[in-house]
Curated annotation (Swiss-Prot):
Annotated compartments: Cytoplasm
Assembly, per entry: Homodimer.
Record's function text: Catalyzes the attachment of tyrosine to tRNA(Tyr) in a two-step reaction: tyrosine is first activated by ATP to form Tyr-AMP and then transferred to the acceptor end of tRNA(Tyr).
GO cellular component: cytosol
Family to which the UniProt record says this protein belongs: Belongs to the class-I aminoacyl-tRNA synthetase family. TyrS type 2 subfamily.
Reactions mediated catalytically: tRNA(Tyr) + L-tyrosine + ATP = L-tyrosyl-tRNA(Tyr) + AMP + diphosphate + H(+)
Protein name from the UniProt record: Tyrosine--tRNA ligase
Motif 'HIGH' region positions after renumbering to this chain: 46-55
Domain S4 RNA-binding: 341-404
Family matches, as InterPro entries: aa-tRNA-synth_Ic, Rossmann-like_a/b/a_fold, S4_RNA-bd, S4_RNA-bd_sf, SYY-like_C, Tyr-tRNA-ligase, Tyr-tRNA-ligase_bac-type, Tyr-tRNA-ligase_bac_2
GO biological process: tyrosyl-tRNA aminoacylation
Enzyme nomenclature, EC number: 6.1.1.1
Keywords: Aminoacyl-tRNA synthetase, ATP-binding, Cytoplasm, Ligase, Nucleotide-binding, Protein biosynthesis, RNA-binding
Length: 405
């Protein structure tokens, strides 16, 4: 068994904020002495049906606690989702319907078990205690925090000073999230850096109810495949945990070498020593960056799919890109799903040819390939089914990855 100090070092690896060492060591020592695991909580509002790698950063840290033998609760904020988290927002968020929340919650629960051990994970819903509160109990909860304290939040302050409306329900959001920690008797709560204020409210709410305050741990925001912006579906720089192995592999191979190390730190269990060793191996020529990136891609696919699919994705990537001499970085071109589209028309649409006749000549001349295989029929029809993707090459230097939405 790891000592309290060893556990603390592993827990803190890769974190953005940790509050605080002294409290955590006390909790860990008591846990070992009493043989009672700590209560660890991560909450998420089911505001969208699927999660991407950026969301998994904090789930990976939850898995660390699970591996250390602590009790893990994944809280689905079905009540708070109806309010809408105002964190980082400059306007009031629209509230979701109960049906949307329930469907998204089921999807979340299924996806987190690609990382967490389902036998050691408790799924809880905050409506199960908040909806049972009497009006008097709810008012008592709101009395534990002041408007002045809530206005310490930067986004609330900006909106207040600019005259932008703030709904009363938005003030209630951090209070109800904080009360979740009271209900679950949480020892440690995890979240992204954008959740720090809400997590600290939970710490304060526990103290107000006469409980030992939870420790707070936040994880950094993960950069998307562009290496610049936060991973986001709206910026189309994300990898979803439900992406195909082929897409996961291809997208991972497009990231920069420096971002590769960042992803190793936040998305794998390599640890501090392992990460330092990887950097040294590349710097001293023992490993090529491309090899290290392949290992990362295979790790991700193994986690969200299987070892066999990880190997198959590498083999397919090598067949298309390495053996055929295609570059690792091929730009995406999105097209709407259709029953079929002529190859020549698709080439024009993707700006690989100026006209159908030019595309036809390229095809007949053997200058067009789909996933590394030559095509010769200028009248060929391509099935464009949603979710499909393939690399289209025209001539010697024009490449595009067709992604069907």
């Amino acid at each position: 068994m790891m000592s309290p100090q060893e556990q603390l070092e592993r827990i803190k690896f890769g974190t953005a904020d940790f509050i605080n060492d002294e409290d955590m060591l006390k909790k860990l020592k008591r846990s070992i002495e009493t043989k009672k695991p700590l209560n660890i909580k991560l909450g998420a509002d089911p505001t969208r049906p699927d999660i991407h790698l950026g969301h998994t950063v904090v789930i990976n840290k939850l898995k660390t606690f699970q591996d250390l033998g602590h009790k893990v609760s994944f809280l689905i904020g079905d009540f708070t989702a109806m309010i809408g988290d105002p964190s980082g927002k400059n306007s009031t968020r629209p509230m979701l319907t109960r049906e949307e929340i329930e469907e998204n919650g089921r999807s979340y629960a299924k996806q987190i078990f690609k990382i967490l051990d389902p036998e050691k994970t408790e799924i809880v819903y905050n409506s199960s205690w908040i909806m049972k509160m009497t009006p008097a109990e709810f008012i008592t909860m709101t009395s534990k925090y002041t408007v002045a304290q809530l206005l310490e939040r930067e986004d609330f302050t900006k909106r207040y000073r600019s005259g932008t409306p703030i709904g009363i329900h938005e003030f209630i959001y951090p209070l109800t999230q904080g009360y979740d920690s009271v209900a679950l008797k949480t020892d440690v709560e995890l979240g992204g850096t954008d959740q720090k204020f809400n997590l600290l409210v939970g710490r304060a709410m526990q103290a107000a109810y006469g409980m030992e305050a939870q420790c707070v741990l936040t994880m950094p925001i993960l950069e998307g495949i562009d290496g610049v912006n936060k991973m986001s579906k709206s910026l189309d720089n994300y990898i979803s945990v439900v992406d195909t192995p082929k897409d996961m592999f291809g997208k991972t191979m497009r990231i920069s070498d420096e971002l590769m190390y960042r992803w190793y730190e936040l998305l794998t269990d390599v640890g501090a020593a392992g990460l330092n060793q990887l950097r040294a191996d590349v710097a001293e020529g023992r490993k090529h960056p491309r090899t290290v990136k392949v290992e990362l891609a295979k790790f991700l696919i193994k986690r969200f799919h299987s070892q066999a699919e990880a190997q198959a994705a590498e083999d397919e990537f090598n067949r298309i890109f390495v053996e055929k001499g295609l570059p690792d970085e091929v730009p995406d071109f999105e097209v709407e799903a259709e029953t079929q589209m002529g190859l020549a028309a698709l080439m024009v649409k993707a700006q690989l040819a100026a006209s159908n006749s030019e595309a036809g000549r390229l095809i007949q001349g053997g200058g067009v390939q789909i996933d590394g295989e030559k095509v010769s029929d200028p009248r060929l029809k391509i099935d464009l089914k949603s979710g499909a993707s393939f690399v289209l090459k025209a001539g010697k230097k024009k490449f595009v990855k067709i992604v069907v939405k």
